[in-house]
Amino acid sequence: MSLPAIQYTVHAADLDGHRYEVTLRIANPNPAGQVLRMPAWIPGSYLIRDFSKHIETIAAFSVTDTAETELQLERIDNDTWKLLQVDLGSVVEVRTTVYAFDTSVRTAYLDSERGFFNPSSLCLAVEGQTHLPTALAIAPIGTWSVQTTLSRVKTDAAGFGFYLAPNYDALLDHPVALGHFQTINWKSRGTPHSMVIQGCLQEVDRQRLATDLSAICESIVDLFEPKAKQAPFQRYLFLVNAVLSGYGGLEHADSTALLCNRDHLPQHGLPLHEDGYREFLGLCSHEYIHAWLVKRIQPKAFQPYDLQVRNHTRLLWLFEGFTSYYDDLQLLRSKRIALQSYLDLVAKNWNMVLRGPGRHKQSVADSSFDAWTKYYQADEHTPNAVVSYYAKGALIALGLDLLIRVQTRQRKSLDTVMQLLWATHGKTQEGLAEDGFERI
């Protein structure tokens, strides 16, 4: 089997110490000096997180079949290293030990119960070669298995082995979960979908989850593709970590990583937490919509991402706010919640915006631009100075939807706009200019 020139091997080496060992193999390093960079942030979460701070050890070696020689690595800045001397034609291995004990969906985690990582937390970028096909090998761990949407090249029944991504950026868009899972499978509009759950002590109600999620996913596919009714991916995966108390999600092109309260899931032998389950379905809906709106329909400012510095856009009120509008609306359209329940959610969001003095101080465009330093770094003064581009963006979407319906006598709606965005910017992958939405 021939593998790409760039290969990463991830080994969950120290479960109790929460450490991954990562080997980066570079078949054709730059002989003038190979530069390596760790991302500073992850797409979808707009905060500089300095993932390099979790690297405990790093060393580089020139390797042959019979010997290896350690190479000198120079630290250039917080995220960057450079191999100073690389012989022409040599193969280089860079070996790192990375600490992983963050239960969020944004970084990496490892203990004796489970593992999870975004490749952006473990995998150094090889400057000048990030456009090349990239392999990821995951070393076996006991009775655990692997869940990810990366393309399998050579794996065992548990999923351990080699995976392939077309380039480095694509690799970063596929989170990986390790451990034992409760699995739910279904098809929505002919496309295979799965949800894998860790951390839930009771047996979940698989049939209830499959029925509800299938209906929600189909309603979202139909929102963007009312005629073709076809999803833009070959399969989709919900990676769920159920904990005592937690909430969050991070979107990816073919999957999402979710954090939820375990008692919000439907479980056999336990009463259903109605409000909590509704919140969980709304989270699933939100991140699933992102597979269209932000992962494929993107701000031009994100094409391509520069993961070393802040990437500013004034359009998060659209990409997050409109997603927030549709996440609950699709629960209603798919008949997962009643009309009164939906109206209660709209009223709650409306009241939250009206109660915040920050709505008088900051536009949603400025809130989007300042997300890195204000929304994602909230303090005691945030409600006085900041308006949520999620919440107010959802109200803008509601108002625009109603306005279009009134002016066209219900012939068109905000759905029409979303379908036009998908046709002109999603299918074509043409980035949306900062003033592009107004033109549409």
Question: Which residue stretches match the model-derived regions?
Answer:
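Juxtacatalytic substrate-recognition/specificity segment
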Residues: 182-316
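Amphipathic alpha-helical substructures
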Residues: 376-440
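Long, well-ordered core segments of solenoidal/helical folds
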Residues: 288-289, 348-358, 420-425
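Early extracytoplasmic/domain-onset interaction patches
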Residues: 1-41
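Non-catalytic architectural context of zinc metalloproteases
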Residues: 48-57, 64-215, 219-231, 245-246, ...
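Acidic/His/Gly-enriched intrinsically disordered linker/tail segments
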Residues: 297-305, 310-390
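Beta/coil-rich, acidic/histidine-enriched accessory regions frequently appended to metallopeptidases
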Residues: 1-2, 12, 18, 99, ...
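Sec-exported extracytoplasmic/periplasmic mature domains
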Residues: 218-226, 293, 331, 401-409, ...
